[in-house]
Design a protein with these regions (language model features):
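Outer-membrane beta-barrel porins/channels
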Residues: 30-47, 51, 104-453
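Bacterial N-terminal signal peptides
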Residues: 15-25
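Outer-membrane beta-barrel translocator/receptor signature
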Residues: 54-63, 68-143
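Small-residue packing motifs within transmembrane alpha-helices
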Residues: 11-17, 177
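N-terminal secretory signal peptides that target proteins for export/translocation
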Residues: 1-11
């Protein structure tokens, strides 16, 4: 469940939380739509498998802290890149909109430090962007709202979300074939939305349409647990678990309901259309369980594979919205209070993510990599909008790495193949997105550099 205090509509906050999958700008957390596949360039190039990976401080702090044991010398890694999203939104009334969104990734950093000599412990620190989004659509607002004739004309529909995780971890190696790890830290969450929205269930305002501008931020604790087993010198098996993260954020929600009030006629058209509320948002990030394996098939050839389970069904089942301390006396009078609650359906499905990849040592310090990821979209058609189209199913990636002495660099290109989803009958109130379709594709490039010292 996702709870929002002081936004003004299910569709609005649904857009904020879910649209992250549109940009695909998310490091960590290992989801195939709303989260990116891998936090560093090597992981991304291998399909996002991190549970069994070793030798990367960023990957260990992103998914499986047990992998810190694979660090033989202190190592610092930094990763940065950019994403390019293209999309198309078509509506049955002839509206056709295009999305062109380019954004830089907030850099990720990881530090791994082995403990004292002859003591089997390694420490790690990670600062990793778990979610990054800047989805920016522009299209004509469909007729709707109370009375069915309200439109705000051509409008920007923009949602931004950031979840930045800072964590401190440690791994112990009680036996040469076994590593255990855990990390603790905090996730900083920032949300913003500017778009038309419709109240979904508020008894007095259900169906009422207005413009919304919302901004909130907050912090919550986060944890990771992991294990790696090495049954032979050529095989590494890993498993990790991330409990759900509940983040309470505070901010403001403001808007303008002029078009809706004008459509209702006197006396509503004479009312001040502007409003402001204090915003308190409760966001729940799903629990994630991952398993994976690496196999050194030949001296130069390695294969990896992994599976993730993401519990979206419990985290994004519905959206509870509470508005408080409203500034507009007329709206407060109609509602009977300066606060209100609205509930919107999300009904996301649990997701299974399948990952596979291979890397080949070319020689001269160079390594070539390729990967593939598949996951059925967690977003059901009946609640999808252009801002929530985290619908990618297939991703392919290719990368190259170079290592010389204490230094290494890895580069990856990841392509989210074009995905299209059609909405038959939307269950969002007013049905503005019924008989609509969204097509999206994305390209991501990331560079990771590291140094041992």
């Amino acid at each position: 469940m996702v709870t929002v205090h002081s936004t003004a509509n299910g569709r609005a906050w649904l857009a904020i939380l879910a649209a992250g999958g549109l940009l695909l700008n998310i490091s960590a957390a290992n989801a195939a739509g709303l989260f990116l596949d891998g936090a560093d360039a090597r992981s991304m190039a291998l399909g996002g498998e991190e549970a069994a990976q070793t030798g990367s401080a960023i990957a260990a702090m992103d998914s499986n802290p047990a992998a810190l044991s694979g660090t033989l010398r202190p190592e610092l890694e930094i990763s940065a890149g950019g994403a390019f999203l293209r999309g198309e939104f078509a509506r049955d009334d002839g509206e056709l909109a295009h999305l062109r969104s380019n954004a830089a990734l907030i850099p990720a950093a990881g530090l791994a430090i082995p403990g004292p000599r002859n003591f089997p412990i390694t420490f790690g620190i990670g600062v990793i962007p778990e979610m990054m989004l800047d989805a920016n659509w522009r299209y004509r607002d469909a007729l709707g709202g109370l009375g069915g004739t309200t439109t705000y004309g051509e409008q920007k529909n923009r949602s931004r979300i950031l979840a930045l995780r800072t964590s401190f971890g440690a791994a112990i190696e009680p036996a040469h074939w076994l590593s255990l790890g855990a990390s603790v830290g905090f996730t900083y969450n920032q949300n913003a939305l500017f778009a038309p929205y419709i109240f979904q269930s508020q008894p007095v305002l259900a169906g009422f349409k207005t413009l919304l501008d919302l901004n909130t931020d907050g912090v919550a604790p986060c944890y990771d647990f992991g294990v790696q087993i090495r049954p032979t010198s050529k095989i590494t098996l890993g498993a990790s678990y991330r409990p759900r993260v509940v983040i309470h954020t505070d901010g403001t929600a403001s808007g303008n309901a002029s078009a809706q009030l004008k459509a209702l006629g006197p006396p509503f058209s004479m009312v001040n259309p502007n409003f402001t509320y204090n915003a308190e948002v409760r966001t729940e990030l799903p629990q994630i369980a991952s398993v994976g394996g690496e196999w050194q098939a030949l001296n130069r050839l390695r294969f990896v594979a992994g599976v993730d389970w993401i519990n979206w069904a419990d985290a994004f089942d519905e959206l509870n919205i509470h508005l408080s301390n409203g500034s507009n006396a007329a709206i407060n009078g109609v509602v009977g209070s300066d606060s209100m609650t609205d509930i919107a359906p999300l009904r996301w499905r649990d997701q299974w993510v399948y990952r596979t990849g291979a890397e080949y040592v070319i020689g001269g310090g160079f390594t070539a990599r390729a990967g593939y990821t598949y996951a059925r979209s967690a977003v059901p058609p009946q609640t999808m909008t252009p801002l929530t189209a985290a619908i990618f199913d297939h991703k392919v990636s290719a990368g190259v790495g170079y290592k010389k002495g204490r230094y290494h660099a890895d580069l990856v290109w990841q392509w989210s193949l074009p995905a299209k989803q059609h909405v038959g009958r939307s269950i969002l109130l007013d049905g503005e997105y019924s008989d609509a379709s969204v097509l999206v594709t994305a390209h991501l490039f990331e560079l990771t550099t590291g140094v041992e010292f």
